[in-house]
Swiss-Prot record:
It comes from the Bacteria. Keywords: Cell inner membrane, Cell membrane, Membrane, Transmembrane, Transmembrane helix. It comes from Escherichia coli O6:H1 (strain CFT073 / ATCC 700928 / UPEC). This is Fumarate reductase subunit D. Belongs to the FrdD family.
Length: 119
């Protein structure tokens, strides 16, 4: 007999954030590291393309704020999800582990949101 009131899982929400963070970390983050961390310091970037004024103007625009928010938050959720499942796989049982790892990710998301909004 099929249970008419099945227990709902919250895992798809966390897997969605994990997947989005993993894709962001694999596709967008390396490009940003290459541009800002390698090409810009050695002078292989054209002129004032990334001058302080232009970067500040981008960071203060709506698209820039969304980009900064996603650049911080998505890899954060991915990493904390991996840590949560790594602890489980290593048989290190953190009391209320779901609350610890996902709660920390949620708190840091709110802190990031406040920081990005107040730029």
């Amino acid at each position: 007999m099929i249970n008419p009131n099945p227990k709902r899982s919250d895992e798809p929400v966390f897997w969605g954030l994990f997947g989005a963070g993993g894709m962001w970390s694999a596709i967008i983050a390396p490009v940003m590291i290459l541009l800002v961390g390698i090409l810009l310091p050695i002078g292989l970037f054209p002129g004032d393309a990334l001058s302080y004024e232009r970067v500040l103007a981008f960071a203060q625009s709506f698209i820039g704020r969304v980009f900064l928010f996603l650049m911080i938050v998505l890899p954060l959720w991915c990493g904390l999800h991996r840590m949560h499942h790594a602890m489980h796989d290593l048989k290190i049982h953190v009391p209320a582990g779901k609350w610890v790892f996902y709660g920390l990710a949620a708190i840091l998301t709110v802190v990031t949101l406040i920081g990005v909004v107040t730029i």
